[in-house]
Amino acid sequence: MVNNRISESTTTAVSNNGSPPKACAGCGGKIADRFLLYSMDRYWHTRCLKCSCCQAQLGEIGTSCYTKSGMILCRNDYIRLFGNSGACNACGQSIPASEMVMRAQGSVYHLKCFTCATCRNRLVPGDRFHYVNGTIFCEHDRPTGLLNGHLNPLQSNPLQGSPMLPDQKVC
């Protein structure tokens, strides 16, 4: 990533059975291993997925790695370089890196701040909601213009960034 966006990714292993060899995002070489590392929408050799600062290998399954300003970072170097907090889109207060958050359309929220703009009920993972012009609405309080629409309920795994219609989300 060349921009200033923050992205957190978890490293996972995927099977390479019967597939043509993939190219490693780090070295460009072919990955002939039985299992591939898949992180940040790219494939890697275990030895090639490293922190840009400390060179720590990030290839352990389940390890979090961060990207910002074109760098791949371990958690410690990310916090050292960019601080340990971001700002909540609702209240503007900082969010420590260790705290769980809710996300919608690139905005980040404290769990307690991810609420319907109308009824103020807190939305939790699995709740359907509508995100209209930066405002969150629960399914019950969605704007009337959406009530007569032809939107079907969506089911998604938000951790994998599945494509969604622009105004209806599932936490």
Curated annotation (Swiss-Prot):
LIM zinc-binding domain location: 22-84, 86-148
Keyword Transcription attributed: yes
UniProt biased composition (Polar residues): 1-19
Domain of life: Eukaryota
GO-annotated molecular function: metal ion binding; transcription coregulator activity
GO biological process: cell differentiation; gastrulation; mesoderm development; negative regulation of neuron differentiation; nervous system development; positive regulation of transcription by RNA polymerase II
UniProt xrefs under Gene3D superfamilies: Cysteine Rich Protein
Transmembrane segments: none
Residue stretches in coiled coil: none
SUPFAM superfamilies xrefs: Glucocorticoid receptor-like (DNA-binding domain) (SSF57716)
Keywords, in A-Z order: Developmental protein, Differentiation, Gastrulation, LIM domain, Metal-binding, Neurogenesis, Repeat, Transcription, Transcription regulation, Zinc
Role noted for this protein: Acts as a positive cofactor of GATA transcription factors to establish the identity of the ventral mesoderm during gastrulation. Down-regulation in the dorsal mesoderm is necessary for the proper formation of this territory since, when present, lmo4 may bind ldb1 and restrict the availability of this cofactor for Spemman organizer transcription factors. At neurula stages, suppresses primary neuron differentiation and modulates gene expression at the Isthmic Organizer of the midbrain-hindbrain boundary.
Protein name as annotated: LIM domain transcription factor LMO4-B
UniProt source species: Xenopus laevis (African clawed frog)
